[in-house]
């Protein structure tokens, strides 16, 4: 791998106006420590042909949904320095393909750039003639194995796809046939095209950095573009799409007003992931009774003595607190020292003969880890150095190769982004992994419990949040974990017949607990959601 501290890569930015989209601006800004914009390649005559009669309703949909906060225009000049140069040219156009003239190509060749990033123009003919060490990188929003072409997100929503993909590839003369440098999967907001696209554009911006790092590491992804090449939708297709969105919005409104998730915890059979299979059905042995006065219990973690520490709520509330449960009694843990807001996901770990709990507490502030006494009372609170400015979701620790590895999501994109930090001391200082986010996939990004060690293999559990929240767990075998890289491979999907879930799994070796939920009708379900806002 190249030493990123030596010299920044010199890049050329291909544009066709004085501004670029907000998400494009953020993508480049996120790489400011490893790249420098040497040259702006400015096409002055780029045009797209439009068939207004055939696609008039699509262009109306564009105004209402596709244009959003992430497509707001930002001047690219804010990314340049005083030494940046601008090369203006007029492209040659044949159909949807555009070509950069030979004179401009020769000017750019003299600059010996490391790579080009394309944010403007249509399809670029002969990108290989723009001589750069790592070629021309370009975004495509859509999974090339399923949905090629355009518009981004439309057909995924229309066909109720599991997720929407995005890729950064090195361009060639054939559609989606260049080397794939970075790829991610993102959650679909089934009832809103605008929200789907805003999240897609905002979250996919991180792919540019990963693509550049993979260029430096000479890494490519084995992705074959076998998906259907879609075109702009007809007016009839837009009408059908709009009706689907209306129906889904009505269903979502009904759920918000009159339905809630009734979470429960159950003891389950022992799990073994040694044999790979598409789905593993969990057998529930005994469901724990919900304590009196409690609305639901979820997020179970098994304590050394076999008791369960979990999240609980009062009735008609969504604000979680921590509770221990055993067959004899239940006890609410005093957590006022951590704040008055939501607490959940109480990950537990033993360290230096001390029992520690690290709950999800993003609503209260930066992450801490707490010492528990034999009565499971908090006796001491430790801040995690290096994470003071982060708001972590469902954090989990793993000790491996003389290091503590902290896996967590961040508030805002917790459904499909997993981040990693490491430290030689459990209390920090923690350093962010160079390939963050290390997982971009709504089927497994968000943690679903502690790591499993089976036959000296490490397995990570990730929530499946593609459609319903916490509806199943994807088990992943960790295949690579070091300061330079992280990789994992899905092994199986855990499910519970007749219920939604599991959402969290925990074991102490002898006992295994899971949580699950059913959707229940309640005429005052809306009340808990209103109270959660205050």
Give the ranges of each region predicted by the language model:
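Loop/turn-rich, solvent-exposed surfaces of beta-rich toroidal or solenoidal domains
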Residues: 403-424, 443-453, 458-477
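Beta-propeller fold detector
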Residues: 284-286, 332-337, 379-385, 431-437, ...
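Structural signature of eukaryotic scaffold interfaces centered on beta-propeller domains
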Residues: 296-303, 347-351, 393-400, 450-453, ...
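Conserved blade-ending motifs and adjacent loop-strand segments that build the rim/top face
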Residues: 434-450, 485-505
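Short glycine/acidic-enriched loop and turn motifs that connect beta-strands
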Residues: 313-317, 362-365, 411-415, 465-468, ...
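Short loop/turn segments immediately following beta-strands, especially the blade-tip
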Residues: 373-376, 423-428, 477-486
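Blade-level signature of beta-propeller repeat domains, shared across WD40, Kelch, NHL, RCC1
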Residues: 474-478, 499-534
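One-carbon transfer enzymes
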Residues: 1-343, 347-356, 366-374, 380-384, ...
């Amino acid at each position: 791998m190249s030493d990123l501290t030596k010299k920044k890569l010199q890049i050329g930015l291909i544009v066709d106006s004085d501004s670029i989209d907000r998400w494009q601006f953020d993508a480049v800004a996120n790489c400011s420590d490893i790249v420098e914009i040497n040259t702006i390649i400015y096409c002055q005559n780029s045009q797209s042909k439009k068939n207004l009669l055939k696609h008039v309703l699509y262009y109306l949909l564009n105004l209402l949904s596709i244009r959003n906060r992430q497509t707001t225009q930002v001047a690219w000049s804010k990314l340049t320095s005083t030494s940046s140069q601008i090369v203006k040219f007029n492209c040659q156009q044949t159909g949807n393909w555009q070509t950069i003239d030979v004179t401009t190509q020769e000017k750019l060749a003299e600059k010996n750039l490391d790579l080009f990033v394309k944010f403007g123009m249509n399809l670029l003919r002969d990108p290989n003639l723009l001589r750069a060490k790592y070629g021309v990188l370009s975004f495509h929003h859509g999974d090339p194995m399923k949905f090629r072409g355009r518009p981004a997100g439309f057909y995924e929503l229309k066909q109720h796809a599991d997720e929407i993909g995005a890729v950064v590839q090195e361009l060639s003369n054939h559609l989606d046939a260049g080397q794939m440098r970075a790829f991610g999967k993102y959650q679909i907001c089934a009832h809103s095209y605008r929200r789907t696209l805003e999240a897609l554009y905002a979250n996919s911006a991180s792919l540019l950095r990963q693509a550049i790092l993979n260029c430096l590491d000479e890494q490519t992804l084995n992705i074959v573009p076998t998906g259907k090449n879609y075109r702009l939708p007809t007016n009839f297709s837009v009408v059908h799409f709009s009706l689907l969105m209306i129906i889904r919005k009505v269903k979502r409104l009904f759920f918000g007003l009159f339905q809630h998730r009734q979470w429960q915890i159950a003891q389950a059979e022992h799990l073994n992931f040694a044999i790979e299979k598409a789905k593993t059905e969990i057998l529930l042995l005994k469901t724990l009774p919900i304590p009196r006065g409690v609305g639901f219990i979820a997020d179970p973690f098994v304590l050394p003595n076999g008791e369960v520490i979990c999240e609980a709520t009062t009735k008609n509330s969504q604000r979680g607190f921590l509770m221990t449960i055993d067959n004899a009694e239940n006890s609410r843990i005093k957590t006022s020292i951590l704040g008055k807001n939501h607490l959940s996901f109480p990950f537990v770990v033993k360290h230096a003969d001390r029992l520690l709990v690290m709950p999800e507490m993003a609503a209260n502030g930066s992450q801490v880890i707490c010492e528990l006494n034999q009565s499971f009372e908090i006796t001491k609170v430790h801040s995690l150095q290096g994470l003071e400015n982060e708001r972590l979701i469902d954090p989990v620790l793993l000790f491996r190769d003389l290091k503590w590895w902290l896996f967590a999501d961040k508030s805002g994109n917790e459904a499909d982004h997993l981040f990693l930090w490491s430290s030689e001391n459990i209390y920090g200082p923690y350093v962010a992994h160079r390939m963050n986010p290390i997982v971009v996939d709504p089927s497994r990004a968000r943690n679903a419990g502690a790591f499993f060690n089976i036959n000296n293999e490490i397995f990570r559990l990730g929530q499946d949040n593609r459609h319903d929240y916490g509806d199943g767990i994807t088990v992943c075998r960790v295949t690579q974990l070091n300061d330079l890289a992280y990789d994992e491979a899905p092994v199986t999907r855990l499910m519970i017949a007749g219920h939604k879930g599991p959402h969290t799994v925990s074991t102490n070796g002898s006992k295994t607990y899971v949580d699950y939920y059913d959707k229940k009708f309640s005429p005052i379900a809306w009340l808990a959601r209103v109270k959660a806002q205050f």
